[in-house]
Regions:
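RNase H-like nuclease fold core
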Residues: 1-55, 59, 65-68
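Generic hydrophobic secondary-structure packing signal
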Residues: 52, 56-60, 128, 132-135
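RNase H catalytic domain
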Residues: 15-19, 62-131, 144-146
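Glycine-rich, phosphate-binding/catalytic loops in enzymes
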Residues: 27-28, 93-96, 135
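Charged phosphate-binding loop/patch that engages nucleotide di/tri-phosphates or the phosphate backbone
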Residues: 133, 137-149
């Protein structure tokens, strides 16, 4: 569908409201045209619940990576929680079941140069990050399920 693009930009974020968490992502072309969004509310799991919005951001990054792999082939994951990239690159150690699962899922895509990472400061008006933040919040408020799996 978007294979003609050299890459896409995927902004990801997570949110937590009253102990429930969710994630969202927004896909942009290299010239910043919004082409796809998705979001989903998280499952009720003690470890994931304790990780709060980080669980949503991990989930959004994994879903965005699947979208990138299927629809374009290369993308940059823009994130405001630095651990998303530090775990995958090995700069930070994982010590929880779900962060290890996240790394096991993401590292092959990173190693094959399908994805790369770019940190952005949250809540500073970066459009893609604000859209992803809104999507993550809406996933909880409206009990949304991921469209693309």
């Amino acid at each position: 569908m978007y294979k003609h693009l050299d890459y896409v930009k995927a902004y990801v974020d997570g949110s937590v409201i009253n102990g429930k968490w969710g994630g969202g992502y927004a896909i942009y072309t290299p010239d910043d045209k919004l082409i796809y969004t998705d979001c989903g509310m998280g499952i009720n799991n003690e470890e994931l619940n304790a990780m709060r919005n980080i669980s949503g951001e991990m989930s959004a990054a994994m879903h965005a990576t699947l979208w990138i792999d299927k629809n374009c082939g290369r993308g940059i994951i823009y994130h405001d929680y630095i651990g998303l990239s530090k775990w995958v690159t090995g700069e930070w150690k994982t010590n929880k079941t779900y962060t290890k699962m996240y790394v096991d899922f993401m590292r092959p895509f990173w190693t094959l140069d399908i994805i790369s990472f770019q940190w952005v400061k949250g809540h500073t008006g970066v459009e893609g990050n604000e859209v992803a933040d809104d999507l993550a919040r809406d996933s909880i408020i409206f009990h949304k399920e991921w469209k693309f799996n």
